[in-house]
Amino acid sequence: MGVVVVGGGNAGIEAAVAAAGICGDVTLITLNRRRIGELSCNPAVGGVAKGTLVRELASLGGAMARSADGAELQFRMLNVSKGPAVWGPRKQQDLQLYMTLQRSELESAGVRVMEAEVLALEGPADRVTGVRTRDGLVAADAVVIAAGTFLGGRLYRGRERWSGGRVGDAAANALERHLVDRMFHVERFKTGTPARLVASTLRTDAMRVQEEDGPGYSFSGRPGDFRQAGERRTCWITFTTEETCRAAEEGMDSSPLFEGSIGGRGPRYCPSFEDKVRRFPERKSHRIFVEPMGAEGRLVYPSGLSTSLSRRTQMRMLRTVPGLERAEVARFGYAVEYGWLQRGEFDRTLRARGVENLFFAGQVCGTSGYEEAAALGLLAGANAARVAAGLQPRRPRRMRSYLGVMVDDLVGKGTREPYRLFSSRSENRLHLRQDNAPVRMGPLRRELFGRLPPWQQRWCEDLSRTEEIMRRARSGGKSLAELARRPDADASGLARICPELEAVPRDVLETAVLDRKYSGYIRRARSRSRQMERMESVRLDGIGDYMEIDLITIEARQALNRSRPRTLGEAARMPSVRHSDLEGLMIHLFGRCST
């Protein structure tokens, strides 16, 4: 019977491709076959932390990295004014080509695609046997729900209200009701998108060109291996004016966000324009990135103008922005409110609470963004296939990957707003870099899929060989490994000192140098990691009801009963659990073991 994946967005595609790599029998069910793989909001992949996550996806065999490389219109490395540890690769995308490449990934993996609405899960409370659609039952050994904004989706624009996952597509309302009936705790979040503008109606001479860093960077393999063959496209920057803010303020009377129609909380770091006007009244100007949506250059995406205000107000706003005064609107902006599952409804393998073969992925887990959704999709799909094959699911480690950080945050801490990944969320960010993802993710890839591809195996071997050369070769009485720690040391300088390093691929040598440069910080982070790992070895499975443990606070007891952490380490990362609560748990466990 295999694995059934519900949803055809980034999470669903990654789940299906990952599952197919293990069990080979995968069905992806979507409401609209023609819109599989569509990037519903901004036309770009990557960014600070997000780009590193895409590199991690690539090192786990993910589809997004390959498609993003193939559909690239422009490349920029963000955060280069800071250290390499927090650089963020970002690629502008040709949306139509990206969709085509994502569909090709499904075809290459042998995934069956079915167009239908999933109404409910079949099977007893602790195990699903398939999904029920309007056309009948689809049997499955495991199921992944990756419904995105379609789960109970409702759209808003001014006083317009209608059901949908995005403009032009229906919502999965029956599935949301079914999850509630199965006693899952479904909450509501909100997100939004700006108008799409006709590029030929813009005055680009009134805007500033945003220069790119040029082609040649690869998400999906070694950076030097990638050659962009497609057309390049320009991005522009403009700014709103006081008149733009005034137009938005005067249109607030019909705002679903402020008149109470939308109850779900939106993303803090990607607010709507009207939200920015209300939250930052002192700001009279906001930056807008005007981004192409395809190689043909017909439409552009004004990033920073996300809004659910009325059509009339949106037109008034556009008329006040330099370069957009005569813009023709292809589709007006809108907001979408949708269902998601609270902390405690899934564990660190993304398996549903109390259901051995049901997994969740993407925005239904509380995230925001293509990259976060895709990464969760890969993990959920691989684990669903492992369970279907009679194997144990795996979980990523917080100290080894941004995927691990995200999963640990969602399960251990939870979120009160759509979760976005940042480098600041990781205490080990000097190690979790985009350049070393192939070696960092190697162990998890072996755990999930049992093998590394040849390119990744070579990369890891090259890095090991380079580190050995740097330890052995000396200059001025010091090893190259020691010299690499100097602030002015770089890969080119070391290669000049040691000709043997000239034969090493440049990206591998740069990673080896950065590892040495950050080695002191990385050692301290690993020491903290070992402390956490010792706590991870203390199991909590034997504790039935935390309310019976008088040694810990009521708040901690309630939180522990909700989340059911497997280890003391997981409990330590919960926001409601204090150090004194951990001591109480240890005393309780020691007393129980000694009797």
Task: Show where each model-derived region lies.
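Beta1/beta-strand and adjacent pyrophosphate-binding region of the FAD-binding site
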Residues: M1-A11
